[in-house]
Amino acid sequence: MMIGLLGRKIGMTRVFTPEGVSVPVSVVEVQPNRVSQVKTAANDGYSAVQLTGGTKKSSKVSKPVAGHFAKAQIDAGDMQVEFRIDSEDAFTPGQVISVADVFTAGQYVDVSGLTKGKGFAGTVKRHNFRTQDASHGNSRSHRVPGSIGQNQTPGRVFKGKKMAGHMGNARCTIQSLELVKVDSERNLLLIKGAIPGAPGSRVEIKPAVKKQARGE
């Protein structure tokens, strides 16, 4: 099973193909990830590798977390993720994994991250509800959601009903994005299209589960 890496969204720009076509890309900085733990089926019940990215002062983490990193003899990180693996022999605690070890240009990836927080939003903005008539007898009900239930039966609002509330700041995954370029010297990935989050936010990049690179 392929693993992914942790990175930080830098922003968006564009690159040009040899034919002169402009391609919008998201730039992700992926500093070398460090293996903080290798979980085995014998000890943990399943096989997985735990990665950490970024850096964090040891004084800013709790003693149990600091001890976890010290056991692997690595610096404390500000991001952590776990990937299931088939073989535990390929990874050792303290191992450093770079972008060139996992990704190649032309393959497709899935990118996960936290979307931009929008605060409290109504149903028109949050769920794309249509607005009611601007005039013709309609007053003070232009952006209201309308009825949220039925009658005495069932006598309640169903779970999952689309209503106003906190919008954004939720985990989101964009699938099957093309990896345009891998810059191993500067630890950068250029990914075609938009990815979740604001510039500077943490993202998780992993090989696509639904789509393979051309020719495979």
Swiss-Prot record:
InterPro entries recorded: Ribosomal_uL3, Ribosomal_uL3_bac/org-type, Ribosomal_uL3_CS, Transl_B-barrel_sf
Any one GO CC term of the record: cytosolic large ribosomal subunit
GO BP: any one term: translation
Post-translational modification: Methylated by PrmB.
SUPFAM superfamilies named among the record's database cross-references: Translation proteins (SSF50447)
Transmembrane regions: none
Residues covered by region (Disordered): 132-155
GO-annotated molecular function: rRNA binding; structural constituent of ribosome
N5-methylglutamine modifications at: Q152
Keywords assigned by UniProt, alphabetized: Methylation, Ribonucleoprotein, Ribosomal protein, RNA-binding, rRNA-binding
Pfam family membership, one: Ribosomal_L3
Described purpose of this protein according to its UniProt entry: One of the primary rRNA binding proteins, it binds directly near the 3'-end of the 23S rRNA, where it nucleates assembly of the 50S subunit.
Family under the similarity heading: Belongs to the universal ribosomal protein uL3 family.
Complex and partners: Part of the 50S ribosomal subunit. Forms a cluster with proteins L14 and L19.
HAMAP family: Ribosomal_uL3_B
Name the UniProt record assigns to this protein: Large ribosomal subunit protein uL3
Organism: Legionella pneumophila subsp. pneumophila (strain Philadelphia 1 / ATCC 33152 / DSM 7513)
